[in-house]
């Protein structure tokens, strides 16, 4: 799962460094606890975004359901905290990843690599094109134990580095998650 702030560059250009960092930290204060409370792990912060994983390094049978539930929670909490002053996109993909500690020269870092991660990164960028706050890949939908209400097919999209188009879906924000 990738979380990315929309239109962050103009905000950073028109605000102080302190305000910019405070805005990022305010978002991450929402993202990190939501992910961790659901058994996930925030792998890294990437500028104005974050990469979270459910099911690595420890396997979670319901990883896709947890990711979708957390994404909805993050979107709701961001809206409650910021209103329209901060817009984010979330992209979720499901599949095998290579997870491990890499590095050298005394600097080691747990990281995730592979096609699944790359597709999730491309899908979060696709939210800017579709205008959706959340996009899920077909792989994510297929891994769900429970199909969420309000699922909307956004069609197949060509993604950089992929020979085949990737089917994506969003969730109608007006339809609440089932309890």
Question: Predicted regions: what is each one?
Answer:
Residues 53-63, 90-110, 126-130:
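Catalytic strand-loop-helix junctions within cyclic-nucleotide turnover domains
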Residues 1-2, 41-44, 51, 87-93, ...:
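Structured core elements
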Residues 20-23, 27, 46, 63, ...:
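Helical mechanochemical/support elements of P-loop NTPase systems and associated helical scaffolds
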Residues 120, 126-179:
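Cytosolic regulatory/linker segments at or just downstream of nucleotide-handling modules
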Residues 9, 51-52, 98-99, 141-142:
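Nucleotide phosphate-binding site architecture
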Residues 1-69, 110:
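Catalytic NTP-binding/metal-coordinating core of nucleotidyl cyclase/transferase enzymes
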Residues 25-40, 56-90, 115-124, 138, ...:
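Alpha-helical scaffold within the catalytic cores of cyclic-nucleotide enzymes
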């Amino acid at each position: 799962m990738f979380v990315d702030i929309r239109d962050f560059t103009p905000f950073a250009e028109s605000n102080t460094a302190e305000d910019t960092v405070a805005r990022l930290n305010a978002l991450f204060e929402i993202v990190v606890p939501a992910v961790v409370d659901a058994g996930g792990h925030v792998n890294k912060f990437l500028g104005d975004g974050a990469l979270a994983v459910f099911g690595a390094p420890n396997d979670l049978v319901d990883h896709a359901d947890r990711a979708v539930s957390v994404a909805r929670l993050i979107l709701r909490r961001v809206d409650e905290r910021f209103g329209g002053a901060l817009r984010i996109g979330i992209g979720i993909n499901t599949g095998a990843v290579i997870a491990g500690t890499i590095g050298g020269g005394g600097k080691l870092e747990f990281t995730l690599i592979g096609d699944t991660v790359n597709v999730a990164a491309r899908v979060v960028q696709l939210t800017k094109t579709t205008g959706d706050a959340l996009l899920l890949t077909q792989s994510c939908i297929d891994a769900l134990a429970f199909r969420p209400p309000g699922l909307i097919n956004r069609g197949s999209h060509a993604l950089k580095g992929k020979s085949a188009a990737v089917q994506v879906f969003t969730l109608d924000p007006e339809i609440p998650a089932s309890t």
